Every structure is written in structure tokens, then in C-alpha cells.
């Protein structure tokens, strides 16, 4: 408060802020819910100043977590049943991003993290390997691996410090044979070079030495695209350590979720809808208090699309349900047998938390289950079929009504200024 006062805020406003408590209500999608462009992830109903004060923190949380969870989910879909380890702490923008990014990656489908604090805070399994510096300290891979094995029952040896195939893998095998049942030779890690070639050669060497169950872990600037390529080349990799390109959202470093006013309460308790127009069609908001439903075809068990309605609408009132593209309205389909799942849950009611916050494991499982309801054609990475996000007829009509109202208002202003 002293700082705010020092930059010019008045005492009466500071006194108001000091006693301010959130009294509004929030409806939101569940963590781990699949979401798509142009649909409301959450809805805030509160006095205007309260709604504005929470804007920045809401966008900060939603944008970052959604970005990293989405990237992690994409990698999980490509990796299939392979183990995925989050290795991004060193490359994260800062320590909080590393911690929360590890959590987001776990919810997105990763199996573990190398960030021990994230493991402690969020109950995420922890995994990792020793560093190149450990091998360099001893100057000899055989000595380093043996020293490591003396202290660790479960051993994963990093084999690319000097020469992967001439030194690293042979010395890992040598130590494992010498120590036998005293250790579990869990795996080796490849962190540089031609991963496809090296993994195939390393697999051959391990198998010939009798270590057919020893796993090969790969890292080094991986993401869904490089993993896809390596799999296509027949790489013999069992687990993937993904860091930089996950934790930074490398190919899309920022998510563009926005927070917009869509209605305001009048003195008599009624609501007036609000719209923001733009020369960019995708930035035109959809006015009014809205709900979002996922329309599941009962025959296929798959999602036909998401259906945005005004608050007082019930999708079941329209039989069959008509879905049409909000821009190319001639694109339409009719769904006769469907389930409409309300994607918004009551989180806060009149300032009180009324929602049971799920655990990280529950959110992770929920996301994985949700993916099963989406057609493969919508999930493919190359030229995916657009997932429908449609407006109800009433919602579509209301939007265009508001557009024309604003256009008339602008026209009147132009005439007044002439």
C-alpha cells in the first residue's frame, strides 16, 4: 500500500483495496479439459473492479499452463507408450516457470521430471541421470561409472562424454558385467550425435552382451517432430528426455488467450451484452453470458464438436441438434442421438470456493480420457481436420445483432462529427 501511495494513488482508493475481498463467481473448464480456439475457457461474474483486478493473474496462469500442457500432450501422442521425462529446468525462463512447467508437462502426459522440487511440491515421479561433469571429473568413463554404481543401485549411465560407441557403451557394459546382481543396469543415455544410428548400434551392443532389458534413453533438443523422425528411422529408443522445446513452448512461445467483457449488469438487474469489434475477424468477441457444451455422438462415442450457447439455452431442446460453421454457415450437420456435456464447472460462488480441486494425477487422467473422444482426424499433426466450434442459432443471431448495433452507433458518430 505504501508503494501504491508513493506512485500517486489516493488514500480513499487504497483503503478500499485494503479491505477488498473477491465476492464474485467463476465458472471454468476443468483442468485437463480439451479446449479449442474461440471458446470461453472460463466465465467471471463479479463487480467490475474485482473482475479487472484478477485479469492479469488469470491470463498468466491459463496461457502458460495451457501452452506447456498442450505441447506435452502432443509429444505424448507421438511417443505412444514410451517413457517421457521432463528435463527442462535449465532452459526454463526462470525457476517458477520450471516448477509449474514440470507440473503442466506431467498433466500433459509426461511420466516424470528431473526437477526434484517439482516432484516434492506436486507429487510427480522424479528421474534423471548423472551429468557429463561427473564423468569428466574422473577423466575416465569406466572409473566414473563404477564410482556411480557404488552409490546407486539403479544405474543409468550417460555414455556420450567422450565417444559413445568406442568408450561410453563398452565401459557401461564392462561395469555392469563386473558388478552383476549388485546393481540394476537400468539403461544408458544418449545426449548428442546421430541418435537414430547410435541407438541402433548401442542396442546391438547391449543385446550381444546379454543386456536385452537395458533401456536406451535419448535427449538433445527433442520434441514431437524429432521423435517422429527418429521413430521413422527405426531408432531403438525406449525413453525420451525432453527439455528446451517443451518447457519454453519452443515453436509457439506464447498462447494468446484473452479476457473480454461480454455483458454488464444494469441497475434493474438485467444485463446488456457487450461486443468488441476488430478488422481481424478472429478478434471479434461473442457477446453475452455463455455456456460451452461438448456434443458427443452416442453411436460413435466421439465428439461432433463444441457448441456455444447463451446462458439460458438447453441443447436438448433442439432435436435433432443443428451444428453450423459460424462463418461458413452453409457447412452444417444434424445430430439426432447425442450427449451434451457442460464443460463449465462452478469454481467460486459469491466469493467462496465450492469446487473440489483435482490432484495432478486426476487432471492427467482426465486429459488422457478426453483425447479418446476426439477423432484421430482432428488430432493428426499434418493437415488435421478442423475441430468444429459452433454457435447456437440464438448465440449467432445475438452476435450479429450486436455487430449491426455497433455499426449503427459508429455511423451516427460519423454523422455527428461531419
Q: What are these model-derived regions, one by one?
A:
Residues 128, 217, 238-241:
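Short hydrophobic alpha-helical runs that function as membrane-insertion/retention elements
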Residues 222-418:
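Gly/Ser/Thr/Ala-enriched C-terminal appendages of enzymes
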Residues 1-5:
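Low-complexity, highly charged intrinsically disordered N-terminal segments
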Residues 6-14, 94, 319-327:
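Short, positively charged
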Residues 8, 14-23, 32-212, 222-232, ...:
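Buried, small/hydrophobic-residue-enriched core segments of structured protein domains
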Residues 26-32, 338-343:
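Short acidic, Pro/Gly- and aromatic-enriched capping/linker segments at domain boundaries
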Amino acid at each position: 500500500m505504501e508503494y501504491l501511495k508513493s506512485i500517486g494513488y489516493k488514500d480513499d482508493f487504497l483503503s478500499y483495496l485494503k479491505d477488498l475481498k473477491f465476492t464474485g463467481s467463476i465458472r471454468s473448464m476443468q483442468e485437463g479439459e480439451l479446449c479449442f480456439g474461440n471458446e470461453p475457457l472460463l466465465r467471471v461474474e463479479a463487480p467490475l473492479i474485482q473482475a479487472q483486478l484478477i485479469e492479469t493473474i488469470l491470463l498468466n496462469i491459463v496461457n502458460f499452463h495451457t501452452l506447456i500442457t498442450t505441447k506435452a500432450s502432443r509429444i505424448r501422442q507421438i511417443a505412444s507408450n514410451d517413457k517421457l521425462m521432463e528435463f527442462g529446468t535449465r532452459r526454463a525462463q526462470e525457476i517458477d516457470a520450471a516448477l509449474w512447467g514440470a507440473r503442466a508437462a506431467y498433466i500433459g502426459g509426461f511420466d516424470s521430471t528431473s526437477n526434484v522440487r517439482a516432484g516434492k511440491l506436486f507429487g510427480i515421479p522424479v528421474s534423471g541421470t548423472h551429468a557429463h561433469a561427473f564423468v569428466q571429473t574422473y577423466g575416465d568413463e569406466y572409473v566414473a561409472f563404477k564410482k556411480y554404481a557404488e552409490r546407486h543401485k539403479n544405474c543409468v549411465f550417460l555414455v556420450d562424454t567422450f565417444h559413445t560407441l568406442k568408450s561410453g557403451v563398452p565401459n557401461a557394459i564392462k561395469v555392469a558385467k563386473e558388478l552383476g546382481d549388485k546393481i540394476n543396469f537400468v539403461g544408458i543415455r544418449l545426449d548428442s550425435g546421430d541418435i537414430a544410428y547410435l541407438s541402433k548400434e548401442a542396442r546391438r551392443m547391449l543385446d550381444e552382451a546379454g543386456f536385452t532389458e537395458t533401456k536406451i534413453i535419448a535427449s538433445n533438443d527433442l520434441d514431437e517432430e524429432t521423435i517422429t523422425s527418429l521413430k521413422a528411422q527405426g531408432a531403438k529408443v525406449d525413453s525420451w528426455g525432453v527439455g528446451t522445446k517443451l518447457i519454453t513452448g519452443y515453436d509457439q512461445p506464447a498462447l494468446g488467450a484473452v479476457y473480454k467483457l461480454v455483458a454488464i449488469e444494469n441497475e434493474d438487474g438485467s444485463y446488456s451484452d457487450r461486443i468488441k469489434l476488430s478488422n481481424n475477424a478472429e478478434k471479434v468477441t461473442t457477446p453475452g453470458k455463455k455456456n460451452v457444451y461438448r456434443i458427443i455422438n452416442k453411436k460413435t462415442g466421439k465428439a461432433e464438436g463444441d457448441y456455444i450457447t447463451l446462458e439460458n439455452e438447453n441443447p436438448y431442446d433442439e432435436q435433432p441438434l443443428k451444428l453450423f460453421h459460424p462463418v461458413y454457415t452453409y457447412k452444417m450437420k444434424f445430430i439426432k442421438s447425442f450427449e451434451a456435456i457442460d464443460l463449465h464447472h462452478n469454481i467460486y460462488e459469491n466469493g467462496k470456493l465450492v469446487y473440489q480441486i483435482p490432484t495432478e494425477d486426476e487432471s492427467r487422467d482426465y486429459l488422457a480420457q478426453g483425447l479418446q473422444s476426439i477423432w484421430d482426424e482432428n488430432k493428426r499433426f499434418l493437415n488435421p481436420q478442423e475441430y468444429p466450434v459452433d454457435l447456437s442459432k440464438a448465440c449467432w443471431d445475438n452476435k450479429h445483432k450486436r455487430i449491426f448495433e455497433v455499426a449503427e452507433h459508429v455511423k451516427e458518430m460519423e454523422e455527428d462529427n461531419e
